[in-house]
Amino acid sequence: MNERTLIQPDVEFINYLKKNGGDTVKECYQCATCSVVCSLSPEHEAFPRKEMIAASWGQKETLISDPDVWLCHGCTDCSTYCPRGAKPADVLGAIRSYVIESFAFPKFLGSAIKKPKYLIPLLIVPFIIIFLLLYNNLDGNFSQLNEGTVKFSRFLPHIIVEAFFIGGNILVFAFTAIGLSQFWKNLNNITPAANKKSFLGVFFATISEILTHKNFNTCSTNSSRFWGHLLIFYGFFGAMLTAGLAVGALFLYDMNPIPFFHPIKILGNLSGIALVVGCVVVAVHRFKTKDEKGSNTYNDWILILFVFLVAATGLLTETLRLFDTPFLAYNTYFVHMVFIFFLLWYAPYSKLAHMFYRTLAMVYLKMNGRDKKAAIFLNMLFITFFIR
């Protein structure tokens, strides 16, 4: 007699998916159209059909240990062609959000960052810290900032800013490492490769794919998202590189402020512009396609908003310094600092954490040979081309 398996759906998990963009999960009837049209679906154990089945049955443990969830880059080809409107891309996005929250350390921050009611309390933390540093530096005499030319080192010495920036980031990376180590240990739910590759053997190939955004540029219905994400990606890391170079220029060459046409300043300005433009492209795309292609969750918008605010206030701060308007320049700089610390200190808990989790998952998949594209997709493209 065949052995029976009792499946017990996790209703709370299903409700989480529905509240976080995956409200169409129950519309799926496993036709596998999503697996056929997905350009990233491997040859065997096709994705994302099996993930949609597991999600509709509330199989939480199966999904949080499934690296295939991270194959999806949100291009929404699957949602576009789904005959039932199940929007697999949104369901997978909700699953990834749950994974990040599950492995977050401390866990309560992973939950808080996704709820609008906690936005103000989370903002107040960096606000109070920076305000106290500023108050201590100025001995409570803020009126002195209205005198003389704009000089941010007088407002808040760079050594203090960098000490908290570096110290905070070390703590953030430590918390991130705890979550990622648990995530890595938990990855399974795929058939291991007979000749499993080494971690280092595939790590640099994975980084190369990320730098070129190769997997973002494979879908046929969502090209504008590729350019928006690419601008944000390089703008973000360009800004981080600028910050590091600026610290070196300050402490090694006492360069303060950095001249407007200096390469470091040019890199920073171009990065800021790339971030602003990228966020606008992504936001416009989301507004245009929200009904037919995908949902827009608070978790999505909070990241787009704060990346935009960090870049916009940074560029505005520089402009106000050049125009030598102390009151506006110092206040904008203060707000800019609050936004920066909010974005970076809460990175392991927001959607920004996907860059860490996706990278590890892609490495794991490559180690086990799960990065190969399905030949059926290439055949479908060929047929579709001639049908049209």
Language-model regions: role of each:
Residues 18-23, 65, 218-219, 325-327:
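Active-site-adjacent structural elements in folded domains
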Residues 103-386:
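Membrane-embedded alpha-helical bundles of multi-pass integral membrane proteins
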Residues 52, 69, 76-79, 92, ...:
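Short, well-ordered alpha-helical packing segments
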Residues 1-29:
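N-terminal extramembrane/targeting module of integral membrane proteins
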Residues 27-30, 64, 71-74, 269-272, ...:
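Secondary-structure capping and boundary motifs in well-ordered enzyme cores
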Residues 1-12, 41-68, 85-110:
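Non-heme iron-sulfur electron-transfer modules
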Residues 22-42, 66-86, 95, 379, ...:
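Cysteine-centered iron-sulfur cluster-binding motifs in ferredoxin-type domains/subunits
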Residues 81-100, 197-211:
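Short, charged cytosolic
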